[in-house]
Each structure stands twice: as C-alpha cells, then as structure tokens.
Amino acid sequence: MTHIRKALAVFAAALSVTTLCTGVATAGEDSAKAVLRYTEHGIPHIVAKDYAGLGYGYGYASATDNVCELAKIYVTVSAQRSRYFGPDGEGYPSLSEAKNNLHSDLFFQQINDSGVVDGLVAQPAPQGPRPEVRQIVSGYVKGFNAYLARTGRSGITDPACRGADWVRPISEQDFYRHYYSIAVTGGLGFVTEGLFAAPPSGAPSPAPGTPAQLSASLRDGLGKGGLGSNGIAVGADGTAAGRGSVLLGNPHYPWHDGRRFWQSQLTIPGRVDVAGASLLGMPFVMIGHTADAAWTHTVSTPVTFGLFEVPLAPGDPTTYVVDGKPEKMTSREVTVQVRQADGSLKPARQTFWSTRYGPVLNDVGGFPVPWTAKSAYALRDANATNMRGLNTWFELDQARSTADVVRALKSTQGVPWVNTIATDRAGNALYADIQVVPHVTDSQAAACSTPAGQQTLAADGLAILDGSRSSCQWGSDPDALEPGIFGPSRLPQQQRRDYELNANDSAWLSNARAPLTGFPRIVSDQDSERSPRTREALLAAEASKFTTDSMKKLLFADHSLFADLAAADLAKLCASFPGGQAPSSSGPVPVGPACDALASWDHRYTLDSRGSLLFQRFAARLGNVDRFTVPFDPKAPLTTPNTLNAGDAGVQKAFGDALVELRAAGLPPDARLRDGQAVTRNGERIPIHGAQGFLGVLNVMTPVWDPARGNAEVAHGSSFVQVVGFSGRGCPDSSTLLTYSQSANPASPYFSDQTKLYSRGEWVKGRFCEADILRSPALRIVVLR
C-alpha cells in the first residue's frame, strides 16, 4: 500500500498516474480525466488537471451514488413525467409545487418552449456562465453519461430505476434546465398551480382570500415553517483560543428526492481545492470550505417574486390597461405527451397567459387571486433571468477570506434566495444577504401598493403593486447587474470579530450587539419577534467561547428553548387538572405519568429524553393559540415573548390532544424519544434525535407522524452538517455529517451508514489535506480515463 500512496502523492501534484486504473478506459485517451479517492463513508476526493476533468469526475461519482435520483430530475425538467409515469402521479416537489405529473410537465414545457434557459446560457458572463463553468458543466455531462454507458440501464443496482426506459444520457441543456428550476424554486416553482389560470368564463370567480391567509400560505409554502438552516460564524474574539474562527453550517433540507446534498472534495492542483456539499447534480461545492475560508447558506426572508394587479379592458379579459393604454396579453399553448392506461401516448395541451410583468396567475400557494372580468394578477419572479448563481459558486469555491466571499457575491449577484455566513483563517465572521431581491423601496411601496399589498408587505415582505401604472414597475440600482433588483450596496452585510449568525429570520439580529437596520421592508424587517431557534442561537453565541468541539456539542445538545419557556408551567398545569383528567377534543383524558415526565425532563431532544415526545406533540397542536402571557418586546428580543398562557382553553386542549395522540400510537406520556422517533432503512430501525424548529431546537428534524407508530420518517431537517475551525497554519479542523448518507440506493454501502452515525451522535472526520486523505483506512482509488 505504501507504493500506492507515494504514487498518489505524485499524481496529486502532476496528475500523471495511469497505473492504478480501476475505472473506465476510453479508447484513444492516454491520460486520466480525473481520479476519485474515496475515504470513509464513500466521500470522493476528486482530482483533475482541468475544469472539464473536475466536472467529469463529479458527474461520474455522483451518478454512481444517485443515478436514479438524478434521472428523476432530468425526466422532470424535460417535461416527460407523464410520458413515463402517467398524468396522475405526484409531481416532483423538489422542483415545483405542481400537484401531479401532468401539471409538472406543462409547467416545465412552457419554460422550455419559451427558450429562456437557452437564451441565458448563450449570454457571456456575467449574465451567462463564465468559460470555466461551461467546461465544468460539459465535463459533468460526459461523466454522468460515461457512468451510464458503463453500467447500462440493466446494470443499475438501485431498484428505483433499474432497467427503466426513462433513464437516459443527458445533455448540457438538461443540466442548465435543472439549475434554472432551482433558481426559480421560490418564485415560479412556488406558484406553479396558479399559472394554470384561464380567462373568466362567466361562472362566478372564487372569492379572494384575505391578506392574513396569503401570509400563512407564504410561510408554509416558502418553507419558513419547516425548511431552513442555521449558520453560525464565530470570529477570533468568540473563540476559546482568541484566534482563528469556527463555522457551523447546518441546512435543514429534504431527506428525499432532488434537494438532497451530496458530499465531495474538488481539486485542481494549484487552482482550486474545496470540500463540502452541493445539491444533487451541481458540480460545485455550494456549502463548504477551502484551506482558509468556510461558508454556509441559510434560507433568507426576502420574497423573491412580486405581484402586479392589472385592470382589464371592458369586455376583453385578455387585454389589460397600463397608463390608460390597452395591451394584449400574450398566450402560449404547450403540448406534452401523456401515457394512457394501455401504454399509448396522447397529447395534452394547456394555454398559459402573460403580461409585460410576467405570467397571469390565479393562486399563490393555495391563496386565491382570482382572474375576473375586471382585473387579473401577474407575477414577476426576480430570478426568472438569473443564471448567474453558477458563477457565484464557482468563485466561492476559490475564496481564501471573507473578503473573497463578499467579492464573489457582489461581482456575480447570482445567489437566488439564501443568506451567506462565512469565516476565515484571519478570524473574521461574516453575514451577508447579497442575493436577488425585487427592487421595491418603501417609498415606492407606499405609492404603488394595492390595499392587500400594504398588508402583505408589512407582514411578509410580498409586494403587490398597481400594474396600471408603469411608474410602479420595479426600480433599479447602478451597481445591480440587471434592472429590477437591488444592488449589493443596498443589501445587508456585516463583518465582525465575535460572531454573525442566521437561523432564517431577517438580517436584523445577525449579531445581538450590532443590529442591522434601515433596509427596505422587502429586504429585511426589524424590531420584530425572532423565532425560538434564532433566540437559541443568539443566546448561545452571547454566552459562549467556542471550539470546534463545543460547537458540535451545542448542535447535538438538542436543547429546546421553547421547553425552557413553557415546560415547567405545562407540568404545573398537568398537575392541576381535577381528578387527573385533562380536557381534549374527544373528552377528558387521564394524565398518568405525564406530569412527572415533564417536571423531570431536561428540555432536550436526545434519544433517551423522557417527556420530549409529549411536549413535541403538544407544541405541534398549538397552532395560532395565544401561547404566552408576556408579549414580544423589541427592546428585549432574546427573552420575549415568554411565560406559558396556561389558563387558555386552547393550550389546555392541545395538551390533552397530545396525550390522546400518543396513546393511539402506543406510546406512554413518558416515552423516550427513541421509542417514538426513528427511520427505517433496509429493515433496520434507526432512532433519530432532534426536533422541529418551532421548538427552538437548533438540530432541526421535521418528522412525519404516523398515528399508529409515532414519528416514523423524516421529511426534512439537518442534512449536510459541517463544523470547520481555522487556527494557526495547519489544516482546517473539520467534521461533517450527511445525515441521510451519500446514496439513495438501498443496495449501496453508503445508503444509511452516516444515518447510523448521526443516530449515535458521531461525526465524520474531515480529510482535506493530502496527508489526511492518504491516511484514510478506507482509501479506495478509481482512475477515470
């Protein structure tokens, strides 16, 4: 083995080894395209001599682990789900909110027919991909196709697509369509069902919803109630050593389908060396670190689309009026092929309507915005012309400092809907929400908002503007790369030496000692209640001096701030019920050991915590109940609101209903978390620690409740987790976990190995530097030629 390691060290410097080939040989090519060096848990360290080779290695390795998941993505963005799976099956929620395959296909077909993706790709940088990005993408496509050519459909080991005719070689167009779908996830992808709007036929239109209902739809649909992330950047003054930095990256993302992360290290000697993870099919590191800088992303609060209400011409619902002049809507009929019960194909057609602002719609995340004889609503997605994010992550992958991170964000302006939190070896901590945001100033909103828009902007940052006036179109900034978005100078950023963090609230309290204020409402609110999870992170940052080990312990402490605020009072309420009977929706229910379990609970969601399941189900049932007696105070944002409103009938009933729910699932009130929260992989039950974000738990796990068994699966939660420390001149001190593991293939050894690690509270040692990679006891080499 020693001579192999020496040869690999030479290869890392010169990329000339050919004697260790265990991969794919391609006739006529004498040198390796890439070398994959696998370490523990199937993590590939991909080395190539150029960007095309780097993409090739990524494409081949990612297909090896997840060919079926990737094939699902490509059949979706090519609008062929109905052709292969029929029209009625569930759409692909990773990429749109389409309710079924047919609507998914029609949605993506109208994007494809519009030519928008091809047009953006054809542009030079900065609007289109820079040359190096094009080389990476070209290599990625060839690498994916090389894997498929080697295995063949019948050789795929994953039963999800073994032998399936919908698994096929891909093109660069497939790749760019996939990226575009990611960019518009928070806009066009969120309102997919609403785009199936038709001119009024004379039948009564559905009643419009209230602004409060729209706010609820936005919070649920855009993920603010579940999907999200934590990012904590600790600078030198916040570390125990007083130098260097520590970063926690902890995105809370789906455990299934196309929004899974996949981990790798990408190296071109002397040019790029970066480790971390990316969404499936993206041959860059999107969250990770270089030798001197580390970064993560968190889902941000700005709503990246806006609505325009347009008046219609009398008697013509497809003509609208701007500045007193009529304009015809444009229409596009799209056609997709649909598999019938007998296996034959028949066409299905749909007409989509559009205005100067964007497509006409009649629904926003389940909230009706009717197209009537008098008015219609059009949507503008600020990311609809954004192909720049690929350039952003290319540049982030070469960052050596937080200054480089800011430079990458400002020069590319491609981040679609996330904050960036970063650290560097010099001891800096950065928060930046330099992303695509609709250019709607407060003064413009005051002059142009509709009555509903006045409420939705204040509550959730959604602008609904008067489309009858061209002066109400989105504005622009001199430093913006395209009209209609804010330039970087107008967006929040802050660098400090103690800490910066975000847990999916606005920019206001990225540091409790240095609030970020004065931004347009659409960019960031201020003086507003912070989530329990944000408060948990801020309180920890204010009270601690961090090491990498203490940061890992903070995350896996699974501590619940909401439990600190309410559990003791809930235990007292439990003990106060007459006759030991709590009220519930189905009548009185005995409290049994519930009171003692809550009173002795440590307020954590570790596997052996008793009382945690009961409190979780109680909190999940509170809904809009007025739960606290002490309201939010903007002068005390870390400690308010507080004190459980134990006298409220809704609070009492939620407790009783939680008891009933546990009993129906066969779980006693004092059950351990491990008894009622687990996933099953290849027949093995794996207990899962953590809990929902609304409980103020940093290590978010959003489980799927089975009434007969308890929490039986994870919908989304902690996914790719990294803790990265810099100190002195040595290698980055990194630990990672991919909670659902590298592969979605149940036949892979990397299907659930890291899930078991996560269950035990263990981490994967980061192997970034050459010596660490070569010391891996699991080292396995694949040379791709």
Where are each of the predicted segments found?
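Secretory targeting and sorting signals
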Residues: 1-27
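Substrate-recognition/specificity elements adjacent to catalytic centers across diverse enzyme folds
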Residues: 30-246, 251-257, 269-271, 276-278, ...
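Long, charged, mostly alpha-helical binding arms that flank functional sites
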Residues: 65-126, 528-608
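Stable alpha-helical elements in mature extracytoplasmic
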Residues: 133-143, 257, 389, 404-408, ...
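A terminal-accessory region detector
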Residues: 175, 201-206, 431, 439-446, ...
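Glycine- and hydrophobic-rich flexible loops that cap the catalytic core of alpha/beta enzyme folds
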Residues: 268-280, 288-293, 297-462, 491
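Hydrophobic alpha-helical segments
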Residues: 305, 375, 415-540, 619-624
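Terminal end segments
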Residues: 508-591, 675-785
